[in-house]
Regions:
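Core catalytic region of metal-dependent phosphoesterases/phosphodiesterases
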Residues: 4, 11, 15-116, 170-174
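Divalent metal-coordination and catalytic microenvironments
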Residues: 10, 30, 45, 50, ...
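Active-site environment of divalent metal-dependent phosphoester hydrolases
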Residues: 12-16, 53-56, 83-94, 128-131, ...
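Short, well-ordered alpha-helix to beta-strand connector turns
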Residues: 42, 77, 119, 138-140, ...
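Conserved catalytic scaffold of divalent metal-dependent phosphoesterases
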Residues: 66, 84-169, 194-197, 218-219
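Short, conserved loop/helix-junction motifs that constitute active-site signature segments
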Residues: 73-76, 136-139, 168-173, 249-251
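Conserved beta-sheet core of the metallophosphoesterase superfamily
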Residues: 156-222
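Accessory, non-catalytic peripheral segments of nucleic-acid enzymes
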Residues: 216-300
Length: 300
């Protein structure tokens, strides 16, 4: 199926209400991913689900960014394999209506809509109904999918509960399982959650280990992860920390949620926001009063 593959997942085109900024981040990521794949000699690309964010509709500006990116991927690789995650599907219990099947008409893109096995590799789209029971019978050494496995972290704080269906131990025959779905990069045993393409919101705060993975199957090598250095970054900080560490803390394309642990006036708050956004090329600075912060903590 491949000698050396460049793999990514969970890019979520159309996130944040079809934000132009987010879709441009997605396109910038695709350009970086292709460049890294070429620099590392990858002839094959694989995407592990959740291309689009909105399950119900597609905005035309998002579609425009999607088609442009898909065409780039089709040209960049000998083959680019692509399967759906749950966000790409209209129905929860079947895959027949989705937002991505048009990609099979783009030269170079191979759209996988059923469990696919070739040599020692299996590609598995989002499982529906009782399909999870088939996992035990897949013999492939390398398995790529979009799985919801218990005990892994959905984000930095929340662990996935056990719903009594697919579990890590069902992957009996695999040596490596690579999955999309959970946005935090993590590994337990043979199961690797790749993590999303780049941080999307404050659930990803302080965790920039996002990007892509390279798998050199020809040389039986361990997976290698590459972080996207120019990714948007999310930080939650205290105002006192921000003032002391502004030179090292703030980076371009950063979203900052600042907890007001010091008394400041409205004018000072406006000055801080304007100065930091202009001087450091921040995207957003939200100032959170202490009382509001306590309410947020309670709701969690």
């Amino acid at each position: 199926l491949f000698k050396k593959a460049a793999v990514f997942t969970d890019i979520h085109f159309g996130l944040k209400g079809n934000s132009k900024v987010h879709n441009q981040d997605c396109e910038n990521f695709i350009d970086w991913y292709i460049e890294q794949a070429k620099d590392n000699g990858c002839e094959t690309g694989i995407f592990c689900g959740d291309w689009h964010h909105n399950r119900n509709s597609l905005n035309l500006t998002t579609m425009d960014a999607t088609i442009r990116s898909m065409e780039k991927l089709g040209k960049a690789f000998k083959k680019f394999y692509f399967f759906d995650g749950n966000h790409d599907l209209y129905y929860k219990d079947k895959r027949d209506v989705n937002s991505t099947a048009f990609a099979k008409h783009i030269p170079g893109i191979t759209f996988i809509d059923e469990v696919y096995e070739e040599e020692d590799v299996a590609l598995v789209p989002w499982l529906v109904g009782d399909e999870w029971k088939k996992i035990k019978s897949i013999k492939a050494k390398y398995l790529f999918g979009h799985f919801e496995l218990p005990s892994f972290y959905m984000n930095a704080m929340v662990q996935m509960p056990d719903h009594g269906e697919l579990k890590a131990e069902h992957f009996e025959h695999q040596e490596y399982v690579f999955s999309g779905h959970f946005h935090k990069r993590q590994k337990q045993g043979k199961i690797h959650y790749l993590g999303n393409a780049f941080p999307h919101n404050y659930a990803d705060a302080w965790d920039d280990d996002r990007g892509m993975m390279i798998l050199d199957r020809e040389n039986n090598a361990e997976p290698v992860y590459i972080n996207w250095p120019d990714c948007p970054k999310y930080r939650t900080v205290k105002l006192s920390q921000l003032i002391d560490e502004q030179a090292t803390l703030i980076k371009p394309n950063m979203y900052l949620r600042v907890n007001l642990d010091l008394p400041i006036s409205y004018e000072e708050a406006s000055f801080i926001k304007e100065t930091f956004i202009n001087n450091f090329n921040c995207r957003e600075i939200s100032l959170i009063p202490q009382k509001q912060l306590e309410e947020i903590s309670t709701q969690l």
